[in-house]
Amino acid sequence: MAEEQAQPQLALERIYVKDMSLEVPGAGVFTKEWNPELDINLSSNAEKLDDDHYQVVLTVSVTAKNAEEAAFIAEVHQAGIFLLKDIPEDQIGQILGAYCPNVLFPYAREVISDIVTRGSFPQLLLAPVNFDQAYAQSQQQVDAEGNA
């Protein structure tokens, strides 16, 4: 009797805010008309916890300047524990680099919006991000550097 092929399993087992902060360097920003310039940075990293579990942390940083003055710096490290069991090795990078950040982003977006409004600034809703495209571009860059 032939052994059954194990079915791949992919699941989010836990989601949590690993770290978050809001810095408002000066109160003078509240006395000026609000017309901010935003600088948004995203990054993610993955850490293998055991044979089947990975922690993926999506970091979202937003720096707002208003009239050339720093208004706020908001940052969240949104984390998730993911089960990846019997996943083909060639698919793990794509899952950790694109799928998991796609899952985490709406939660990080909500935290950023919440802490910014709690700082008495207007609501900030970050636009959706195509992590699949970003991952593909990063892989192309790695491949190009490897061939150089």
Curated annotation (Swiss-Prot):
Return the SUPFAM superfamilies for the record: SecB-like
Could you name the domain of life of the organism this protein comes from? Answer: Bacteria
Return the GO cellular component terms, semicolon-separated.
Answer: cytoplasm
Q: Where in the cell is it found?
A: Cytoplasm
Which keywords label this protein?
Answer: Chaperone, Cytoplasm, Protein transport, Translocation, Transport
Q: Name one Pfam family in it.
A: SecB
One Gene Ontology term of the molecular function aspect: unfolded protein binding
Record-linked InterPro entries: SecB, SecB-like_sf
Q: What does this protein do?
A: One of the proteins required for the normal export of preproteins out of the cell cytoplasm. It is a molecular chaperone that binds to a subset of precursor proteins, maintaining them in a translocation-competent state. It also specifically binds to its receptor SecA.
> Could you describe the subunit structure of this protein?
Homotetramer, a dimer of dimers. One homotetramer interacts with 1 SecA dimer.
Question: Entry's NCBIfam families?
Answer: PRK05751.1-4 (NF004393), secB (TIGR00809)
Q: What family is this? A: Belongs to the SecB family.
The entry's protein name is Protein-export protein SecB
Q: Which species does the entry assign this protein to? A: Psychrobacter arcticus (strain DSM 17307 / VKM B-2377 / 273-4)
